[in-house]
């Protein structure tokens, strides 16, 4: 099925591209989310007229994304305290959902778990520093350091005082 993209989509195409996709992908994803329209002469003419509006919308989304990436980069790092073994292995793990929740609380805007890129595409399972990448928008990324500390150490120190 031939469609015209109304938004840039990773690994598919940029705004205004006329591409061929499977009909199920178009019907179930692109059309309901208003990311594409069926490629016809009439739709091509309408798209040409509205192209500058779509470009300005895309530019405003890009500016928002750059602002969000800067806010996350300015945050620099977040600290998580969890229980762990003597050897530094966590009882459980820290996943993208946990990190997204902490970032959302810290910066004041929503960061979805699907935007978090963990090292080795696996949950964090040990104490220490871990570098995490956040995919904010198409080619805009932010970097963050996650410090994982043992909560038992902090409780023992507070009991002795």
Swiss-Prot record:
Residues annotated as transmembrane: none
Gene Ontology molecular-function annotations: rRNA binding; structural constituent of ribosome
UniProt xrefs under InterPro entries: Ribosomal_bL9 (IPR000244), Ribosomal_bL9/RNase_H1_N (IPR009027), Ribosomal_bL9_bac/chp (IPR020594), Ribosomal_bL9_C (IPR020069), Ribosomal_bL9_C_sf (IPR036791), Ribosomal_bL9_N (IPR020070), Ribosomal_bL9_N_sf (IPR036935)
Record-linked PROSITE patterns: RIBOSOMAL_L9 (PS00651)
Any GO CC annotation of this UniProt entry: ribosome
Pfam families assigned: Ribosomal_L9_C, Ribosomal_L9_N
GO process terms (BP): translation
Keywords associated with the record: Ribonucleoprotein, Ribosomal protein, RNA-binding, rRNA-binding
Superkingdom per UniProt: Bacteria
HAMAP family: Ribosomal_bL9
Similarity section: Belongs to the bacterial ribosomal protein bL9 family.
Role played: Binds to the 23S rRNA.
NCBIfam families: L9 (TIGR00158)
Name the record gives this protein: Large ribosomal subunit protein bL9
Lineage: Bacteria, Pseudomonadati, Pseudomonadota, Gammaproteobacteria, Enterobacterales
């Amino acid at each position: 099925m031939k469609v015209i993209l109304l938004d840039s989509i990773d690994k598919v195409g940029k705004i205004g591209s006329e591409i061929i996709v499977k009909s199920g992908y178009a019907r179930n994803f692109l059309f309901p989310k208003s990311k594409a329209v069926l490629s016809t002469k009439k739709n091509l003419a309408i798209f040409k007229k509205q192209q500058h509006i779509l470009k300005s919308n895309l530019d405003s989304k890009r500016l928002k994304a750059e602002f969000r990436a800067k806010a996350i980069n300015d945050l620099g790092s977040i600290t998580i305290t969890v229980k762990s073994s003597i050897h530094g292995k966590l009882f459980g793990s820290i996943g993208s959902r946990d990190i997204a929740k902490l970032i959302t609380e810290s910066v004041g805007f929503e960061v979805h778990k699907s935007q978090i890129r963990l090292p080795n595409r696996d949950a964090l399972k040990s104490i220490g520093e871990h570098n995490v990448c956040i995919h904010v928008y198409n080619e805009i990324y932010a970097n963050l350091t996650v410090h994982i500390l043992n909560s038992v150490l902090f409780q023992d120190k507070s009991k002795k005082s």
